Design a protein with these regions (language model features):
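N-terminal glycine-/serine-/threonine-rich phosphate-binding loop
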Residues: 1-50, 56-66, 180-185
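Short beta-strand segments at enzyme active-site cores
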Residues: 8-10, 43-56, 108-113, 188-191, ...
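Short acidic, glycine/serine/threonine-rich loops at helix termini
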Residues: 19-21, 55-60, 121-127, 200-202, ...
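A glycine- and small-aliphatic-rich helix-loop capping segment at beta-alpha/alpha-beta transitions
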Residues: 23-28, 60-71, 125-134, 203-210, ...
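Polyanion-binding loop/helix "lid" in catalytic or ligand-binding cores
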Residues: 25-32, 75-93, 98-99, 165-182, ...
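Ligand-binding beta-strand-loop-alpha-helix segment within the catalytic cores
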Residues: 64-188
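Glycine-rich beta-alpha junction loops
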Residues: 113-120, 193-196, 236-238
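Acidic, metal-binding active-site segment of PIN/NYN-like and related structure-specific nucleases
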Residues: 227-245
């Protein structure tokens, strides 16, 4: 018998393109795939990454500060909030348009500006690992490191990128509001870029200099929503072992035990495919029937 599923879909920031025109094209294609699920009767909650986008925003804000000394530095948490707004804006409108093309004239789509609490003592703050911004050559990376003091690392053989702290999500601050919207059959876009990273100081939520991995945030969200399925979309076709090597092998499916084995072998790059596989293992292991 057909069962309606509650599905959390996580879109990779790299899959959204590197420019605004590219993003407009990408979200239209993504909206069609998401609306296929909605048309089948499933509840869909959308999370998106922001790696390239938050890096570009941060670079622009940094350049402005260097050009005009009266302009203060823009915190990374504020850059994440900016990325939530403009990516959510494009996604929300693309979904709305595609739904109406299919006759869903009264199906509301809403983007929630989402804060996610992290532990200020998370060791990730001492070990930056989350790539943001566009891919650079070695020479470009060396210039950014010297000019702006950024930590730069090679990303899975595809070039160099800036890396920042990526603490694990502890609590989704707006979780109750998200639950209410989903229970009311709204299509919700939330936890953009993993959520705006904040730490709790008394009653005050203070922005943290970090970018939370959207895969871990999606896993936490899916568990809190009691979702049936977590889908993580990427810019590459599939998960692979021996990625980029002569004996590279694409995987059509993967059990939890196999995934744990490959993680132990170091098959997946930190800040890239590793958190995606870890998030899927965590979610699939958290309840019966979860995939």
């Amino acid at each position: 018998m057909y069962k309606r599923k509650r599905i959390v879909v996580a879109l990779g920031g790299n899959a959204l393109g590197n420019t605004l025109p590219e993003q407009m094209i990408a979200v239209k294609s993504t909206a069609k795939a998401l609306c296929d699920l909605i048309e089948e009767g499933h509840q869909v909650v959308v999370v998106h990454g922001n790696g390239p986008q938050v890096g570009m925003i941060n670079n622009a804000m940094t350049a402005l500060t260097h050009e005009d000394e009266t302009q203060p530095n823009t915190p990374l948490s504020v850059c994440v909030a900016m990325s939530q707004a403009y990516i959510g804006y494009d996604l929300q409108n693309a979904l709305r348009e595609e739904l109406r093309k299919r006759g869903f004239m009264r199906t509301p789509v809403v983007t929630v500006v989402t804060q996610v609490r992290v532990d200020p003592d998370d060791p990730a703050f001492e070990n930056p690992s989350k790539p943001i911004g566009k891919f650079l050559t070695k020479e470009e990376a060396e210039y950014q490191a010297k000019a702006y003091g950024h930590v730069m690392k090679e990303d899975a053989g595809r070039g160099y990128r800036r890396v920042v702290a990526s603490p694990k999500p502890v609590e989704i601050v707006e979780q109750d509001a998200i639950n209410s919207l989903v229970d009311a059959n709204k299509i919700v876009i939330c936890c953009g870029g993993g959520g705006i990273p904040v730490t709790l100081e008394g009653h005050h939520l203070k922005g943290a200099s970090a970018v939370i991995d959207k895969d871990f945030a999606s896993c936490l969200l899916a568990k809190q929503l009691d979702a049936d399925m977590l889908i993580i979309l990427t810019a590459v076709e599939k998960v692979a072992v021996n990625f980029g090597k002569e004996n590279e092998k694409w995987l059509d499916d993967l059990t939890v035990s196999q995934a744990k084995k490959y993680i132990k072998e170091g098959q997946f790059a930190a800040g890239s495919m590793l958190p995606k596989v870890q998030a899927c293992v965590d979610f699939a292991s958290s309840g019966v029937g979860r995939t």
